C-alpha cells in the first residue's frame, strides 16, 4: 500500500500522536502498538506554548519533545469502565500511560496533576474536542477526546529567545518557570521583626506593659495627656536603643511609637471624647445645607458663565468625599486618620482617580478657581453629610499624636489638617453668630417644609404658597437631586408644572439638560425609572420644542453610573420610544454590554412585549439606515456573550429575516439560542428557529457536552425539536434522541413520520426493545449491509445511570447510528412505516415476524445442486461487485479523511491568526504593531453545518460499505474456493472409480451378494469393498457439494438483493442526501457571509 501524507496539524502534540504517515518506522512505534486497541484521552497544551517555548532542563523546544515517548506518556490518560461514571459528587481519577495520577473535576473544568509528577499543577480545561479518528493505526475508538489545557505539565518552560522582540510578553502562566517579584515594604518588614522579638522576649513585654499601666494611671480621665504619652514612648526608646536586639532597626522610634499607639489607642480615644463632650460639632442642624447655600459665588455668576454641569460635578465629588470621610470613625491610629483625611480632600478636589463613570466626564472644575474658601465650603458640606460625631477629637488627635510633629505643619498632610481645623472654626464661628443660627434655622425649617410637601407620603399635589419657597428652589439634596428631580420621583407633577411655568427664568432649558443626580441620572432618566410617564412626556415636549437635534441626541444618550441611557430603562413606554427613538444611539452599551435594543428584548414583564419589541427593532433599523449602514446583529452582544436571539422571548422571525445572522452562536456558557428556548420552554421561538435551514440542531455545549435535548423536560418541546431532527436525518423518516435512564433501564425518544392526523409522532421506547427489534431484523436479513451486530453490542453496554463527557459522546454516536440505520430500513421498506407508534406496536410486529420466520421451510431439506458454470457466473458477479465496492470504499476513506482535515485545518488557521494578532500587538515597533490590527481573515471555506452533515453521512456509508464488502469477501474468497476444492475432490473420486471399475455403470449396492467359489469369492469381496469405499466417498463429496452450492446459491441470491438495496441506498444517500445537501447548505450559508 502506498504511503500518503496528510497535512500537518498546528498543534505538535496532536500531530505527533494522530497524524503519523508511517507508524511502523516512527520513533513512537512502541507507543502506537501499546495504544492500538485502547481508548484514551489526550491532554493537549495550547499550540502557542508548544511552538514558542522550550524546556528549561533539557533546553529542547517543546515541539521537539512532542516526538519523545517519555514526554508524551504523561499527556495520555487511559480509560477504564469507571471513566464513564458521572463524577459530579466526586473527582474522577485517571492513570497516565507512564503510571502517573491525574484527577479531573469535570464540573469545574479543572485537572490536578498529582502522584508521579515532579511538579504538581492545577490545570484549567480550556476546551474539549472530539477528534474523529482518521488514521489507520488506532483501532480502539472511532472518536478520541482531546482536553486542551492552559499550559504544559511535568516540565518547566520559558519563552524562546525570538520572543524578545515583543514587549510585555506575559503569556507565561503562573506555574511557568519565572522569577517571582516579591518586593516587600521595608518598614512593614521591620515592624514584623520588631513584634516577633517582643513576643519571644517576655521580659521586654512586661516592661512595656508596665509603661502602658503607667499611662492609664497617670493620665486623667478627661485628658489624653499627650506629654505623658510622649514621655513613656521616649522612656521605652531610651531603654531599647542600646539593646543589641534592636540595633539593626533604622526606624526604632517610629516602631515603638506605633506599638504604644496600638495598645493605648482606646484609652486615649475615651479620654478625648470625654474631654470634648458637650463641645463637639453638631451637624444635625445643618443637615439641609445645600451647594447653592455655600457656593453662592457660583450661583451669582452671569447667565452665560453659570453652568449647572459644574454643580453636578461638585455634587459627585461631595458624595465620594462624604462616603470616604465616614471611614474616619473606623480608624485606630494617627496613620489611618491622616490617610483618610488626605484622600477625602483629594476626592473632593478631583486630584485623584475617580470611578470609571467620572473618568468619562469632562473635568468642568478645571475652569473654576478652587481656592481655599471654596474648598472649606465644600468640606463643610462633606462633614455635614458624613455625620461625623467626634470631629474635634479627630482634629486634636491628628495635631498631637504624630510621631513627627512637622508632618502636621507642612506638606499635603499639613494642608489637610489645617483645612479640617478651618472647618471646625467655621462651625464654631457660625454658632457664635446668633443671626447666622437664626437664619440657618429658618432656612432649615423652610427646606424641611418644602421637602415634606414634595414627599411621596404627602397626598397633596400642589403648593398654594409656592412663591414663599422661591429662595430655596435651587436646593439639591445629598443624592444630587434638584427640586425638579424630587418632584419627578415623587410624582408631584402639578408642582413640577407650576415650577417650570412660573419660574422659567430660574430653570432655563440649559439647566434642564444639565440637571443630573450624583449617579448621572438626568431628569428624563429619573422620570422613566420612577414610572412617571406624564413627567417624561412634559420633559420630552420641552426638549423637542426648544433643543436642536444635536442637543437632543446628546441629552437622550447621556449615561448614568451604569453607562445606561434613558433608552436602557424603556420597557413598555411605547409612546416615549416612538417620540425619542430616532435620537437614541442604538449601539451604545451599558456596563453589562447591553444595548437599548437588548434591554428592551430582555424586559419580559411588559404587557405588550411583542409590539414593543417589533417597534424598537423597526426604529433601530431605521436609525441604522439613517447613518448609512445596515443593521448589525453583532453590535448587540452583551458581556456574557448573549445575543439578541438568546434573550428574545417571542417573535424571533424579526431576527431570522436577517442575512448575516449566526443562529447557532454560543454565549460564554456555551448555550445556543435554541438551548435557551428549550430550557425556558419558549415554544413559539422553538417552532420558528427549527424551521430555519441554518440551525445546527445538535450543537454541543463545550463545558458539559449537553445538546438542546438535555435541556428539554417537556414532551411538547422534545416533539418539536425532534421533528427538526427527522427532517435533517438521512432520509427524513425517523430520529432517535434524548436517551434517559430509569432504574438502570435506558429509554430513548423516537420521532418519526406518522400516517395519523399529525405529520410526526414522538414516542418513548425502551432500548432493550430496540435491541430485540434489531435482532429480529438481523435474522430476517443476515446479509444486510447495515452493521446491526455493532449496534446490538453497543446497546448492551448502556448500563450507566449517569454519564461523563466520554459516555455522552458514545451515546450521541449510538443515537446517530440508530437514526441512520432505521432511516435506511424504512427507506428500503424492511419495516412498516407505522412501527414506532408505541412500544406495543414494535413488540407485536416482532412476534408476528418470528411466527412467519418459523413457518418458512428450511433450505437444507432440498439442497441445490450447483454446476461449475453457475458457480463461475456467481464468482464473476461477486468479483465485479467486490472490485467496485473496494474501489468505492477506498474513495470513501479518502473523502472522510479530507472532510476531517478541512475542519481541523480551519481551526488551525483560526488559532494561528489569533496567535499572530496577539503577538503582533506586542511588537516593540508601534508602526509594525498597528499593522496587525487590519488583518481580516475568513477561514470558513465551508460552513460548519454542511461539513458536519456530510462527514456523518460519509462515515455511515463507509461503515455500510465495509459491512457489505466483508460478506462478499467471505463468499468470494472462502465459500466459493471451498466449493471448487470439494468439486475437484469429487471429480478425482469419480476418475478413480472409473479407472478401477471401468465396466461398472454405477457403484453396486452393499446389499448385492451371490454364491461364489471360495478363492474367487475372496478376491471378489476385496474388489467389492474397494468399490463400496469409493462409492461412499463419492456420495459424501456429492452431499458436501450440494450443501456448499446451496449455501452459495442462497447467499448469492440474498447478496444480490442486498447489493441492489445497497446501490439504491448509496445513490440516494450520497447524491441526494449528502453531496446535493452539502452544496445547497454550504452555498446558502456562505452567501450570507459575502
Swiss-Prot record:
Transmembrane feature ranges: none
CC annotations in GO: early endosome; late endosome; plasma membrane; transport vesicle; tubular endosome
GO MF annotations, alphabetized: guanyl-nucleotide exchange factor activity; SNARE binding
Domain of life, per lineage: Eukaryota
Gene3D superfamilies, sorted: Ankyrin repeat-containing domain, VPS9 domain
Residues covered by the VPS9 domain: 289-436
Family annotation (InterPro entries): Ankyrin_rpt-contain_sf (IPR036770), UPF0507/Ank_repeat_27 (IPR051248), VPS9 (IPR003123), VPS9_dom_sf (IPR037191)
GO biological process: early endosome to late endosome transport
PANTHER family (alphabetical): ANKYRIN REPEAT DOMAIN-CONTAINING PROTEIN 27, DOMAIN PROTEIN, PUTATIVE (AFU_ORTHOLOGUE AFUA_1G09870)-RELATED
Family as reported in the entry's similarity comment: Belongs to the UPF0507 family.
Protein name (database record): UPF0507 protein SCY_4172
Annotated source species: Saccharomyces cerevisiae (strain YJM789)
